Design a protein with these regions (language model features):
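Loop-centered beta-sheet repeat module
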Residues: 36-95
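Structural motif
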Residues: 25-35, 82-89, 152-161, 208-222, ...
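Residue position within the beta-strands of beta-propeller blades
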Residues: 19-21, 78, 148, 202
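Structural signature of eukaryotic scaffold interfaces centered on beta-propeller domains
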Residues: 6-15, 22-24, 58-80, 125-143, ...
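C-terminal structural cap/anchor segments
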Residues: 135-185
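Conserved blade-ending motifs and adjacent loop-strand segments that build the rim/top face
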Residues: 53-56, 96-130, 163-197, 209-211, ...
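Asp-box/WD-like beta-propeller blade repeats and closely related beta-sheet repeat scaffolds
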Residues: 1-30, 43-58
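Predominantly five- to eight-bladed beta-propeller fold
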Residues: 96-116, 217-251
Length: 251
């Protein structure tokens, strides 16, 4: 046990358990990722120094912050709030998988300039008054496309990278006409948790906010009747477990 560090999420892969890692003020080192011994729960390995890879930031700010996303089979991916690199966890080590470059990424110099601001909420308020990019999340990949989200001014942006054409497309507006009826115009904002070459999995009702929204969508008949298993939604209540939905990629 180390009272100067804690974890929020775990990831199992290839017989090992990994956790994200956050540290309190006064910690001797600030790593972002650790491996945990499955027998005694002690941390055995540490990776990704926060200063080098996350602009020095090593606090948990967003309660539902999800640094891991796992392929159904294969290497889990890992990225933190201010990282410009998505890492792959392999059976042997941790490897950079995708590096993103933009002059608009939040910089270490900018975060250092906020050190006198003691409250993280104020730091993010200041950040959202800029046009800086942060929080790469919801990463997934098919045979042809790479998809991920990022934020500017607390607004969600969507990026598609076409491996065949070697080109990227950015937008804020992708309508989720798969889950919702066509005329609703509901924006695509899934919480992806896993993917493979043919489909992606998202989770709904995994917190109070998404639970209330999803239950109201069902009540208001906003869910597309073409969704397989939609009849089972009628028995869902606020006491139900989270709902996992999968989206199939088109060829």
């Amino acid at each position: 046990k180390n009272e100067k560090m804690f974890s929020s999420r775990i990831q199992y892969y290839n017989g090992k358990i990994y956790t994200d890692l956050y540290t309190y003020e006064g910690a001797d080192s600030k790593f972002l990722l650790s491996e945990v011994n499955m027998k005694d729960g002690k941390r055995t390995s540490f990776w990704l120094d926060a200063v080098q890879y996350n602009k020095g930031w090593n606090e948990l700010f967003i309660a539902n912050q999800q640094p891991f996303i796992s392929q159904y089979e294969g290497k889990p991916r890992f990225s933190q709030l201010f990282m410009d690199t998505i890492f792959a966890i392999t059976k042997d080590d941790i490897q950079p998988y995708i590096v993103l470059q933009s002059k608009n990424f939040v910089t270490k110099d900018y975060l250092d300039s906020q050190k006198e601001t003691k409250k993280a909420s104020k730091i993010f308020s200041n950040l959202n008054n800029t046009t800086k990019i942060y929080n790469i999340c919801n990463y997934l990949e098919s045979d042809r496309y790479v998809y991920f989200n990022y934020y500017i001014r607390d607004n969600l942006y969507i990026t598609f990278y076409d491996k065949l054409q070697k080109s990227a497309y950015m937008t804020q507006n992708v309508v989720n006409d798969l889950l919702y009826v066509d005329d609703e115009g509901v924006q695509l904002f899934p919480n992806f948790i896993s993917f493979d070459e043919k489909r992606a999995y998202s989770v709904e009702m995994n917190n109070d906010f998404s639970r209330n929204v999803f239950l109201k969508d069902i009540q208001d008949n906003r869910i597309n009747r073409k969704v397989k298993g939609i009849d089972s939604f009628q028995g869902i209540s606020e006491d139900s477990n989270p709902v996992i939905i999968y989206y199939e990629f088109k060829n």
